[in-house]
Amino acid sequence: MIEEGGNKRKTMAEKRQLFIEMRAQNFDVIRLSTYRTACKLRFVQKRCNLHLVDIWNMIEAFRDNGLNTLDHSTEISVSRLETVISSIYYQLNKRLPSTHQISVEQSISLLLNFMVAAYDSEGRGKLTVFSVKAMLATMCGGKMLDKLRYIFSQMSDSNGLMMFGKLDQFLKEALKLPTAVFEGPSFGYTEHAVRTCFPQQKKIMLNMFLDTMMADPPPQCLVWLPLMHRLAHVENVFHPVECSYCHCESMMGFRYRCQQCHNYQLCQNCFWRGHASGAHSNQHQMKEHSSWKSPAKKLSHAISKSLGCVPSREPPHPVFPEQPEKPLDLAHLVPPRPLTNMNDTVVSHMSSGVPTPTKRLQYSQDMPNLLADEHALIASYVARLQHCTRVLDSPSRLDEEHRLIARYAARLAAEAGNMTRPPTDASFNFDANKQQRQLIAELENKNREILQEIQRLRLEHEQASQPTPEKAQQNPMLLAELRLLRQRKDELEQRMSALQESRRELMVQLEGLMKLLKAQATGSPHTSPTHGGGRPMPMPVRSTSAGSTPTHGPQDSLSGVGGDVQEAFAQGTRRNLRNDLLVAADSITNTMSSLVKELHSGAEAEEQAGTEKTREGLPPRGTFLSVFLLHTWTKLAGCQTHSTSRERSQAYGKWGGTA
C-alpha cells in the first residue's frame, strides 16, 4: 500500500511538472491577457521541444501512424497517442546532430500529460483524431502560413469550400489550449466564435481564410496565435537602446516606443508589467518594434519614401488556386492484379493481326520493364519494412499488407505458368534474369559496404566527441598552464611597448637635434657674425611638465657639453663662429651617444631611478634632455645676433643657474 501511494504521488508530480515550471516563470504578472497567453503557450512549446518540429514533420508522423486514414471523430486511446508522440520525437532526434539531441522520454512525458490535461479533462482515456491533429498542428513550429493551409485542408470539402461545422469544431479544440494554461476567461470557446471570424461570408475559400487569419488584427478569439509566432521570431532580436524604466543598456525581443513622450522607450518586460516613470503613463499609445534600424537607415528610408522610391509592400501570402490540388496518384506503390494466364496476352496479340515473330519481339522487349517493376516493388516493400519503427495493429494496415503479398504471389504464380514459351524466349529471359540478379547482388554489396562505412564513421565521431578520463584529468592542468603563459605574454608585450615608446621619444629628440645642427652648419657661411639681417632659428615650444633640471644622475655626464658650449662662446669674436659650432656639435653628438648607450644598458636601473625621481618631484631623464637641448640651441641661436660678450656671459650665468 505504501509503494502504491508513492507511485501515485510520483505520477501526479509528473503530470503537474509542466504547470509547476510554468508558474515559476511568473507569467501572471503580465497585465495584457494576449501577451500572457502567448508567453505561456510559447513556454509549453519550447519546454516540450515542439518548436523543433514543423508542420511537415507532423503530417509525416500522422501518415506513418495511420491517422490520415481515420475519420476525425474516431477516438484513439492514450497508449496510441503515446505511440504517435514517440514517433515524432524519435524522428526528430534522427534529424538533429549528435550534439543537439533532446531527452526523448522527458519530452514524451511532458507533452502527453499536457494533452491529456487539456483534451481529456473527464478522464475517459480517449481523444479524438481531430483533437490530436488540431493541437499538434497549432503548437508545432514552422511557418504560420503552412499551419493554416493544413488546418484549412482538414476543414474543407472536395471542392475547396470551408465547412462551418468543421471550423466550429476546430475553434472548440484550439481554444482548449488557452484554457489549459488558465486563460479560459479571456479566450474561452463561445457559440458565436465562428461568426466573429467570418461575419458575412457564405463561401470561404483558402485565400479568404488566410486573409482573415493573417490580418492585422486577427480574429479576437485567435489573436494569441500570430502573437506566439512573433514571439518566436523576436526572441533573439537585439536593440542597442536603453530602457527608460529599468535603465538596462540594451533590449532583447520587442521594443516599445511612446508616441507622446519624446524618446521614451521600454523593454518588453517593463511594458508587459505596466511599469512607467516620469511623465509617461500607461494610457499613452505605444508602438511595438520587432527590429532595430540605425538612424542612417531611418533617414534613407524617409528620403526614399518621400521620393516615392519605396517598393510596394508584398502581400502577406501568395495567392493559391481556388480549386484544391488533386491528390498524388500512389497506385504504383500497389501494382495492379496480374493476369492469371498468358493466353489473354496471346489472344490480344493474335486479334490485332500482328505476326508471331513481332509478338515474340514485343514480349521480349517488355520483359525488362516487368522485371524492373518487380524489383521496384520489392525495394519499396523492403524500404517500408525498414522505415517502420513500430508495428501498429491497425486493420487497414494489415489488409494492405495482405493485399500486397497476395498480388505479388499471384504475379509469381503467373510467371511460373509461362513455361511453355519457345526455347529462344526462355534462354533470353533466363539471361536477363541472371543479369538482373547479378546487378541486384552487386548493389546490395555496395549498399552493405556503405552502411558499414557510415556506422564506422559514426562510432569514430562519437568517440571523438566524448573525452576520455585521462584527457578530462589533464585539461585543468593544461588550462592553468595556458593561462599563465598568456599572462606572461601580456606582461612581456606591455614591457616591450613601454621600451619601444621610450626609444621612440629619444630617437625623435635626436633627430630634431641633428636637423638643427645641420641647418646651423649650412647657414653659417652665408651669415656674418656682425650682420643682423638673418632670421633667428625658431625656438621649440617648452613643455610645461619640465620643471627644475635635476642636479644628479644623467646631468653629470652632460656637464662637459655645457663646458664646451661656454668655452666655444667665451672667446667672442676671436674665434671663427663656424669652428665653434662644429666643436659644440661634435661634443653634443658624443655626449648624446653615450647617454643613449647608458639608457639602453640599464633598463631596470632606469625604472628604479625614474620611480625615485617621481617620488622626489623631479622630472625624468628625457625631460632633462629636452631642457638641456632647449637652452643649448637658445645660446646657439643667440650667437647670430649682435649681442655683446657681456650679454653672453649673463646668458651663460643664467644657463648655469638653470642647470
UniProtKB/Swiss-Prot annotation:
* UniProt keyword Lyase, yes or no: no
Q: What happens when the gene is disrupted?
A: Homozygous knockout mice for Dtnb are viable and fertile, and are normal in appearance. Double knockout mice for DTNA and DTNB genes have a mild myopathy plus synaptic defects and abnormal motor behavior.
Query: Where are the ZZ-type-classified zinc fingers?
Result: 238-294
Q: Which Gene3D superfamilies match?
A: 3.30.60.90, EF-hand
Q: Where is this region: Disordered?
A: 520-562, 599-620
Localisation per UniProt entry: Cytoplasm; Postsynaptic density; Cell projection, Dendrite; Basal cell membrane
GO molecular function annotation:
DNA binding; zinc ion binding
Q: Which residues carry this modification: N-acetylmethionine?
A: 1
Q: Quick one: which residues bind Zn(2+) 1?
A: 243, 246, 267, 270
Stored InterPro entries: Distrobrevin, EF-hand-dom_pair, EF-hand_dom_typ1, EF-hand_dom_typ2, KCMF1/Dystrophin, Znf_ZZ, Znf_ZZ_sf
**Tissue expression:** Expressed mainly in liver and lung. Expressed in brain, namely in neurons of the cortex and hippocampus and in the dendrites, soma, and nuclei of pyramidal neurons of the hippocampus region CA1. Expressed in kidney, namely in epithelial cells of renal tubules, collecting ducts, Bowman's capsules and glomeruli. Expressed in blood vessels and pia.
Coiled-coil intervals, chain numbering: 429-519
Gene Ontology cellular-component terms for this entry are: basal plasma membrane; cytoplasm; dendrite; GABA-ergic synapse; inhibitory synapse; nucleus; postsynapse; postsynaptic density
Positions binding Zn(2+) 2 in this chain are 258, 261, 280, 284
Q: Composition bias, kind Polar residues: at what positions?
A: 521-530, 542-558
Q: How is it modified after translation?
A: Phosphorylated by PKA. Phosphorylation at Thr-11 alters the interaction with KIF5A.
What's in the keyword line of the UniProt record?
Acetylation, Cell membrane, Cell projection, Coiled coil, Cytoplasm, Membrane, Metal-binding, Nucleus, Phosphoprotein, Synapse, Zinc, Zinc-finger
**Which Pfam families does the UniProt record give?**
EF-hand_2, EF-hand_3, ZZ
Q: Which residues carry this modification: Phosphoserine?
A: 394
The UniProt entry lists the main location of this chain as: cytoplasm
The entry assigns this protein to a family as follows:
Belongs to the dystrophin family. Dystrobrevin subfamily.
Q: Tell me, what does this protein do in biology?
A: Scaffolding protein that assembles DMD and SNTA1 molecules to the basal membrane of kidney cells and liver sinusoids. May function as a repressor of the SYN1 promoter through the binding of repressor element-1 (RE-1), in turn regulates SYN1 expression and may be involved in cell proliferation regulation during the early phase of neural differentiation. May be required for proper maturation and function of a subset of inhibitory synapses.
Q: Its quaternary structure?
A: Interacts with dystrophin short form DP71 and syntrophins SNTG1 and SNTG2. Binds DTNBP1. Forms a specific complex composed of DMD, SNTB2 and SNTA1 in neuron; the interaction with SNTB2 and SNTA1 is DMD independent. Interacts with UTRN and dystrophin short form DP71 in the kidney and liver. Interacts with SNTB1, SNTB2 and SNTA1 in kidney and liver. Interacts with KIF5A. Interacts with HMG20A and HMG20B. Interacts with OLFM1. Interacts with PRKAR2B and PRKAR1A.
Comment, domains? The coiled coil domain may mediate the interaction with dystrophin.
Q: What is this protein called?
A: Dystrobrevin beta
Q: Origin organism of this chain?
A: Mus musculus (Mouse)
